[in-house]
Amino acid sequence: MSLFPSLPLLLLSMVAASYSETVTCEDAQKTCPAVIACSSPGINGFPGKDGRDGTKGEKGEPGQGLRGLQGPPGKLGPPGNPGPSGSPGPKGQKGDPGKSPDGDSSLAASERKALQTEMARIKKWLTFSLGKQVGNKFFLTNGEIMTFEKVKALCVKFQASVATPRNAAENGAIQNLIKEEAFLGITDEKTEGQFVDLTGNRLTYTNWNEGEPNNAGSDEDCVLLLKNGQWNDVPCSTSHLAVCEFPI
């Protein structure tokens, strides 16, 4: 059998098959244009954007890495508040008596005795020449005439006070000492008619002259010891003998 008579038939079959594929593809595009693509597959596109962060996961277990080196010490912090006082400790034992060089105590005692003897001699000289002693008081005058304020300042300068008799014996001692009228440490400057000593205490002994005190002239706030031993009120601005008393 000859092959040539079959050639037209073969060509016709191929055309028919090609037409069939074309029609089928076109029909498919008309029916599902968005689904079926008859062309060859395209290349991959670019990666899309990252999605949103997911929820935080649970804390994982510590890793197995090596422990790092210890860091340097931090800065010194501020001092804390003082703590409460501790309880007292036990009482210590009595210490041994101290030692002093030999002869010091006996030397001090002898010096003290010599000083006391010398002071006693000086008192006697003063008493004999210028002053009078009664009990534990020593009355002394320098013979100067001055106002009451100056008498107070003079006595304070020598750590004494203006003579203030507390009894008849002291009043007599001052009387025997003076040759002129002398100020006493008594005034009524704060309250008229209420005579007190220079410390503000009321008097427990007085020896007023007859008719005294009379506050003549309304400014007689100081007191004089007269030569007869009695008292008289006078102005403090007048000048009279200064007599001081020293405690002994």
Swiss-Prot record:
GO terms for cellular component: cell surface; collagen trimer; external side of plasma membrane; extracellular region; extracellular space; multivesicular body; serine-type endopeptidase complex. It is found in: Secreted. Residues 49-61, 93-102 have a biased composition (Basic and acidic residues). The modification Hydroxyproline is found at P47, P73, P79, P82, P88. Residues 112-130 form a coiled coil. The keyword Disulfide bond applies. Residues 134-245 form the C-type lectin domain. It comes from the Eukaryota. Residues 75-87 have a biased composition (Pro residues). Disulfide bonds join C155-C244, C222-C236. GO terms for biological process: acute-phase response; antiviral innate immune response; cell surface pattern recognition receptor signaling pathway; complement activation, classical pathway; complement activation, lectin pathway; defense response to bacterium; defense response to Gram-positive bacterium; innate immune response. GO terms for molecular function: calcium-dependent protein binding; D-mannose binding; identical protein binding; signaling receptor binding. Plasma protein produced mainly in the liver. Residues 42-99 form the Collagen-like domain. SMART domains: CLECT. CDD domains: CLECT_collectin_like. The coiled-coil domain mediates trimerization. Oligomeric complex of 3 or more homotrimers. Interacts with MASP1 and MASP2. Interacts with MEP1A and MEP1B and may inhibit their catalytic activity. Interacts with CR1 (via Sushi 24 and Sushi 25 domains). (Microbial infection) Interacts with SARS coronavirus-2/SARS-CoV-2 Spike glycoprotein homotrimer; the interaction is calcium-dependent and modulated by Spike glycoprotein glycosylation state. Calcium-dependent lectin involved in innate immune defense. Binds mannose, fucose and N-acetylglucosamine on different microorganisms and activates the lectin complement pathway. Binds to late apoptotic cells, as well as to apoptotic blebs and to necrotic cells, but not to early apoptotic cells, facilitating their uptake by macrophages. May bind DNA. Upon SARS coronavirus-2/SARS-CoV-2 infection, activates the complement lectin pathway which leads to the inhibition SARS-CoV-2 infection and a reduction of the induced inflammatory response. This is Mannose-binding protein C.
